[in-house]
């Protein structure tokens, strides 16, 4: 598996640390942020990312709206929803937002590998 540059967006700092550790151990470069607004800034002006893993329920800009905006800005970028609140949203709403995959927290190792191997 090639090294990926992954942006993880979640307002839960404990989850960000966990994802950084898990993905880092798998040999990937991980950038984390606790807000979709900052993530949008990073994507507009900074690095090239292989994929994004984002929470859905965040203050100010939620994961749905963040995904919609990023798919306009970077339509080929893979964006995955990872949330403890997946079932609070309609699947059509999530798919229409443009997510490439939707996963429930806590993510299993198999699902994480599915995300990482999706674009090989």
Region locations from a protein language model:
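C-terminal output helix
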Residues: 107-116
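Receiver (REC) domain active-site loop signature in two-component systems and cognate sites
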Residues: 58
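Two-component/phosphorelay signaling modules centered on CheY-like receiver
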Residues: 13-31
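Acidic catalytic/metal-coordinating carboxylates
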Residues: 34-38, 62-66
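As written
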Residues: 63, 95-100
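Active-site beta3 strand of CheY-like receiver
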Residues: 47-53
